[in-house]
From Swiss-Prot:
Composition bias, Polar residues: 53-68
Membrane topology: Multi-pass membrane protein
Subcellular location as annotated: Cell inner membrane
Function noted in UniProt: Required for the insertion and/or proper folding and/or complex formation of integral membrane proteins into the membrane. Involved in integration of membrane proteins that insert both dependently and independently of the Sec translocase complex, as well as at least some lipoproteins. Aids folding of multispanning membrane proteins.
Gene name for this UniProt entry: yidC
Molecular function terms, GO-annotated: membrane insertase activity
UniProt-annotated stretches for the region Disordered: 43-69
Family the UniProt entry places it in: Belongs to the OXA1/ALB3/YidC family. Type 1 subfamily.
GO biological process assignments: protein insertion into membrane; protein transport
Pfam family, one: YidC_periplas
GO cellular component, one term: plasma membrane
HAMAP family: YidC_type1
Protein name stated in the entry: Membrane protein insertase YidC
Length: 536
C-alpha cells in the first residue's frame, strides 16, 4: 500500500491532504474546542461581596501578577435603575451601575419576533463593572446601589447623557455616559473626595452567537498596532498592556469593547478566571475617560465609529489576506446590492486572476495525459530500479515539454484563498439574514434543503470528468473519484455563502476547462493537418 501511495502524483497528494485536513479540522473543532465559560452556582449576597476582588498589578507592564477575579452573580434582571432606548438597541443598567443587558432590535437580529439579548446570564462579568484595589472598598461597592439621574433615556438623532452615582465611605463614584444612536457611548468615571485606584471592565464576551468554529475571547490592539488575542479556555497567565488602543470581548458576531483615540492609550489588565477565560479591565487612578460600544461586529459601523475598531473582526493567522478579501467583497456588494451576487462576483474575480496559472496548469495536465501510456511503460520497465526510473521519467518530461508540477500551482494558490474566504464568510455579520435567490434567505447558515452542497458535489464530479488525469494505478483513481462525495459531506453544515463560493468556483472552472480543452483540441487538429514535410 505504501508503494502505491508513493506513485501518487503531487496534485493528487495535495487534493487528498486537503480532504484529510478538512476531515480532521471539523471533528477536532467540535470535540476539542476550548470549553466555554459556565455560569457559577448561585451564592449569597455576603459571599458575592466577599468574592469581588480587583486585579492586583505591579507598575511594570506585562510583568505584574493579576489575581483571579470572581465574577459578579447579581441577577441582571433585578433592580434595573435606568433604560436606554435607541432605534437599533435597548440597554438596561442595574443597581450596581453596570450594563445588565443589551437587546438588538433590527429585523435580522430578532429571534421568534423577540429582541436579541447579547450578554451572558447572571454570573458573568458585566460591562461598566467597577472593582477597587482596596478589598474593603471593593466589598462596600458591591453592597451599595447606584442612583441614576434619569429612569429612561430615549435616543433619536442626537446623543443623550445619563449620570450614575454611588456614595461610598469617604468618597463618591460618578459615571457619566453619553449614548449615540449606533450603540456606541462616551464614558467618564471619577472618584471625588479621596484618591482611589479602580478597574473598569467592558464585560465578558457576548453569548448570542457562541460557535466552536469561531474565535471567542478577548482581542486587544497594542500601541504599536499589534493585535493580541486570548481565546476562552486558553488564558495561561494574567497580563498587563500599556497604551492599548482598544480591548474587546468578542464572540462570532458581537462585541463589547472600550477604546480611546488619544495616543496615550489605555492601561489594560487581562485577568484569568477559574475556567481560564480572559476577563479584561482598564486600570485608572481617580479619573478615566474612554469610549465604548456594544453590538454587532459590522465592518462599516465599526469603521464609522473609529476606523481602528475594524481590527475587532478577527480572522486569525490569515487576517493579512482575509481583510483585503472582505473589503473587495464589501465593494462588490455596494456595486450590486446583494451579498449573494457579491460572492458570485468575488468568485469570478478570483478565477480571472488565477486564469493564467490555471491555463498553464491545465495545459501541463493535458501533456501529462498524452504521455501517460509511456509513463506507465517506463514505470513497469524500471520498477525495480528507482534511479533509472527517475532519470527516464525526467527525460520523457523534457522531450514532451511536460511539467509534473505544472498542475499543482493553481491548486496550491487556491487553498489559502479558500481558507481566507472561509474566515471572511464565516465571520461576516453582514451575511446574517442576507438572502440570495429562491430558498437561500440567510447566507450565514447552512442550506436547509442541502441543495447547494449537492450541486457543489455534482459540479466537482463533472469537473473531474473534464480534467485530464494521469492515473497509473487503480488506488489513485478510486481515491480521486470519492473526493466529490467527501467534500459534499464536509460542506453540508457550512454556511450557504461559503458553499455558494465553492459551487460557483467549480462552475467557472468547468467553463475554463471546456474552453481550454477546445483550444487544445483545435491546436492538435491543426498540427495533424499540417504536412509532415513542411517546415517553418
Amino acid at each position: 500500500m505504501l508503494d502505491n501511495f508513493d506513485k501518487l502524483n503531487l496534485q493528487m497528494r495535495i487534493l487528498i491532504a486537503t480532504a484529510i485536513s478538512l476531515l480532521f479540522f471539523i471533528p477536532y473543532s467540535y470535540f476539542f474546542a476550548p470549553v466555554k465559560e459556565a455560569p457559577l452556582k448561585e451564592s449569597t449576597s455576603m459571599e458575592r461581596a466577599e468574592q469581588q476582588a480587583a486585579p492586583q498589578t505591579s507598575s511594570s507592564p506585562k510583568e505584574g501578577q493579576v489575581s483571579s477575579v470572581a465574577m459578579a452573580e447579581t441577577s441582571p434582571s433585578k433592580d434595573i435603575i435606568a433604560t436606554v432606548q435607541g432605534s437599533h438597541f435597548r440597554l438596561e443598567i442595574d443597581s450596581l451601575g453596570r450594563i445588565a443587558q443589551v437587546y438588538l432590535k433590527d429585523a435580522k437580529f430578532l429571534k421568534e419576533q423577540k429582541e436579541l439579548p447579547l450578554l451572558a446570564p447572571l454570573s458573568s462579568l458585566r460591562p461598566l463593572e467597577v472593582r477597587f484595589s482596596d478589598a474593603t472598598t471593593n466589598k462596600e461597592a458591591f453592597a451599595k446601589s447606584y442612583y441614576s439621574d434619569r429612569d429612561l433615556v430615549e435616543i433619536r438623532n442626537t446623543p443623550e447623557t445619563l449620570t450614575l452615582t454611588q456614595e461610598l465611605e469617604g468618597f463618591k463614584l460618578t459615571k457619566k455616559l453619553t449614548f449615540y444612536p449606533d450603540g456606541n457611548y462616551d464614558l467618564e468615571v471619577e472618584t471625588s473626595g479621596s484618591q482611589k485606584r479602580f478597574f473598569l471592565s467592558p464585560g465578558a464576551r457576548p453569548i448570542a452567537e457562541s460557535d466552536k468554529f469561531a474565535f471567542n475571547g478577548v482581542v486587544l490592539k497594542e500601541s504599536g498596532g499589534t493585535i493580541h488575542t486570548t481565546e476562552d479556555g486558553d488564558a495561561k497567565k494574567d497580563e498587563i498592556f500599556e497604551g492599548a488602543r482598544f480591548v474587546a470581548s468578542v464572540d462570532r458576531y458581537y462585541t463589547t469593547l472600550f477604546f480611546v483615540k488619544e495616543p496615550q492609550g489605555l492601561r489594560v489588565v487581562i485577568s484569568k478566571n477559574a475556567e481560564k477565560n480572559p476577563e479584561p479591565f482598564v486600570e485608572a487612578l481617580d479619573h478615566l475617560k474612554l469610549s465604548g460600544y456594544i453590538g454587532a461586529k459590522d465592518f462599516r459601523l465599526l469603521e464609522s465609529i473609529y476606523p481602528s475598531l475594524t481590527d475587532v473582526v478577527e480572522y486569525g493567522f490569515i487576517t493579512f489576506f482575509a481583510k483585503p478579501l472582505f473589503l473587495l467583497l464589501d465593494w462588490l456588494y455596494k456595486f450590486c446590492g446583494n451579498w449573494g451576487w457579491a460572492i458570485v462576483l468575488l468568485t469570478l474575480v478570483v478565477r480571472i486572476i488565477l486564469f493564467p496559472l490555471t491555463y498553464k496548469g491545465m495545459v501541463s495536465m493535458q501533456k501529462l495525459k498524452d504521455i501517460a501510456p509511456k509513463m506507465k511503460e517506463i514505470q513497469e520497465k524500471y520498477k525495480g530500479d528507482p534511479q533509472k526510473l527517475q532519470v527516464h521519467m525526467m527525460e520523457l518530461y523534457k522531450k514532451h515539454g511536460a511539467n509534473p508540477m505544472g498542475g499543482c500551482l493553481p491548486l496550491l494558490l487556491q487553498m489559502p484563498i479558500f481558507f481566507a474566504i472561509y474566515r471572511v464568510l464565516y465571520n461576516a455579520i453582514e451575511l446574517k439574514g442576507a438572502d440570495w435567490i429562491l430558498w437561500i434567505n440567510d447566507l450565514s447558515v447552512m442550506d436547509p434543503y442541502f441543495i447547494l452542497p449537492i450541486l457543489m458535489g455534482a459540479s466537482m464530479f463533472l469537473q473531474q470528468h473534464l480534467t485530464p488525469t494521469t492515473f497509473t494505478d487503480p488506488m489513485q483513481e478510486k481515491v480521486f473519484k470519492f473526493l466529490p462525495l467527501i467534500f459534499t459531506f464536509f460542506f453540508v453544515t457550512f454556511p450557504s455563502g461559503l458553499v455558494l463560493y465553492w459551487f460557483v468556483s467549480n462552475v467557472f472552472s468547468i467553463a475554463q476547462q471546456l474552453f481550454i480543452n477546445k483550444t487544445l483540441e483545435a491546436k492538435k487538429r491543426a498540427a495533424a493537418a499540417k504536412p509532415s514535410g513542411l517546415s517553418d
